[in-house]
């Protein structure tokens, strides 16, 4: 929908915010938004918790990046998802930095780790590809998410900050590495992941790993 309608140059951050909510409300189980939608085009995408309004709403320009972070409260769960969308043809720098963020996202999602591991011990997996280029992001990699409860819910989290909370089966956490070039663009890729026992069906290995855990991507 964005690719089709952005070519006119008239599509705005607020247009997208309102259209996304209308799509969401077509579902039978939707009860409302889980947080105000973050809808940032170009430099506004580099503001991690940007809140669009009538005065700040920018048009989606060609050859830029558009970041949208949204979620809903449903009878059977709570969602929080971020996508970064190329409008037109992104620059080579944008492509490379997006790829580094995506590599970190995938590496964390595929992690296999022993019981009693905390989120802070896994955080480096999401950042290492960015660190190779001297880049980083200033927010946590993941926060706990409730089920038809709070979209930010502890005690589990994944971040550089020391955290002794063990990841346990059933915990749901966001996986959201990013990169932000102030005044230019923002990149974030976010799915929700659940901590599971490392069974062969989830890891792709020949047998279960009895003393290990892994993640299942829910989004």
Positions of the model-derived regions?
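Active-site neighborhoods and metal-handling regions in enzymes and metal-associated proteins
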Residues: 1-219
């Amino acid at each position: 929908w964005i690719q089709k309608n952005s070519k006119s140059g008239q599509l705005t951050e607020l247009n997208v915010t309102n259209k996304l909510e209308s799509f969401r409300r077509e579902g039978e189980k939707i009860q409302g938004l889980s947080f105000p939608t973050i809808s940032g085009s170009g430099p506004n995408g580099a503001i991690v918790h940007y809140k669009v309004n009538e005065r700040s709403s920018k048009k989606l320009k060609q050859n830029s990046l558009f970041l949208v972070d949204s979620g809903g409260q449903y009878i059977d769960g709570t969602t929080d998802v971020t996508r970064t969308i190329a409008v037109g043809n992104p620059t080579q720098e944008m492509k490379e930095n997006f790829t580094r963020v995506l590599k970190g996202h995938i590496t964390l999602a595929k992690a296999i780790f022993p019981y009693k591991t905390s989120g802070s011990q896994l955080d480096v997996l999401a950042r290492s590809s960015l660190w190779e280029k001297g880049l980083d992001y200033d927010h946590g990699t993941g926060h706990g998410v409730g089920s038809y409860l709070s979209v930010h819910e502890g005690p589990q989290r994944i971040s550089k900050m020391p955290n002794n909370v063990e990841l346990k089966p059933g915990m749901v956490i966001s996986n959201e590495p990013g990169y932000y070039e102030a005044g230019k663009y923002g990149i974030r890729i976010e799915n929700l992941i659940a901590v599971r026992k490392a069974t062969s069906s989830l890891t792709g290995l020949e047998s279960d790993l009895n003393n290990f855990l892994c993640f299942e991507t829910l989004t």
